[in-house]
Design a protein with these regions (language model features):
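Topogenic membrane-insertion module of multi-pass membrane proteins
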Residues: 1-59, 242, 260
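Hydrophobic, membrane-inserted alpha-helices
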Residues: 30-34, 90-92, 210-218
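C-terminal ends of transmembrane helices
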Residues: 63-72, 119-137, 188-197, 243-247
Length: 260
């Protein structure tokens, strides 16, 4: 290829390290879609496992991109689209096939609400990326429940169903419909929720933190549904705690900005 001066221009080459985060994002997308495929075949454990693995990969791609200095606009857009499918569309379809299809009315509407609210939450997040004033983010909080966490919370009835040896009460469409709509509302809410990206561990606590991660991994392997149920319940309980913590931050900021 030649420019106007007749000199050859080398085609722009992308370093391999820049492709690694995007490859992880695509893997998360594939796992989310694979969850739908397993749900169609009534393989509920595999469906849940696929979407949970997608959530783990989603938590890795951004950090790996920063570690490799491979952040890009393309990667950010791909991550958002992947999240919408893996944590909005896929959970909605799985819940519909598992329970909501048995509702006499509005079962599909509840599933759509979860998928649409996930898309709206991601759109709001993207629209605020370049915004200068983000009170929640500057204080270390998210606005509303993030998409991966929302998917995990939406699956609480399925976790209970599996833990209780598939008791039909947890699969009943009325329970699942109400819960799905509640989680959909949390995703688009303006409630402050803790952002684990803002967590800083003191140096003297590093070994304890690593031991905790190892124990969590062991629990996830030996009793996955009980562990995921406990984790989702803990996250849900922490929402009012985060609300109280942010209220303290607001009062502190108001006091600092007030007259001396």
């Amino acid at each position: 290829m030649s420019d106007d001066n007749g000199t050859d221009q080398e085609p722009r080459r992308i370093p391999f390290r820049a492709m690694i985060p995007n490859a992880i994002t695509v893997m998360a997308l594939c796992l989310g879609l694979t969850g739908i495929r397993f749900a169609i075949g009534d393989e509920w454990e595999k469906a849940l496992g696929s979407i949970i693995l997608a959530g783990i990969l989603d938590g890795m791609d951004g950090r790996i991109a920063r570690l490799l200095r491979a952040q890009s606009k393309f990667g950010a857009e791909l991550d958002s689209l992947s999240d919408n499918i893996a944590f909005g569309t896929a959970p909605a379809v799985v819940l519909f096939l598992w329970s909501l299809q048995h509702a006499p009315k509005f079962g599909w509407t509840a599933a759509l609400a979860l998928a649409v609210c996930c898309a709206l939450r991601l759109a709001r997040f993207n629209a605020r990326l370049d915004a200068g004033e983000q009170p929640h983010k500057s204080a270390g909080f998210n606005t509303g429940v993030p998409a991966p966490a929302g998917a995990g919370l939406a699956f609480i009835p399925m976790f209970l169903w599996l833990v209780s040896d598939r008791q039909p009460v947890f699969q009943h469409w009325s329970l699942v419909m109400g819960w799905t709509l509640f989680i959909a509302a949390l995703m688009i809410s303006s409630l402050p929720t803790y952002s684990w990206a803002s967590i800083r561990i003191r140096r003297e606590w590093r070994l304890f933190a690593l031991a905790g991660v190892a124990l969590f991994g062991a629990a996830l392997l030996t009793a996955p549904w009980q562990t995921l149920l406990a984790l989702a319940t803990l996250y849900l309980v922490m929402i009012p705690v985060a609300l109280a913590s942010y209220a303290k931050v607001r009062r502190r900021r108001a006091g600092a900005a007030g007259p001396a």
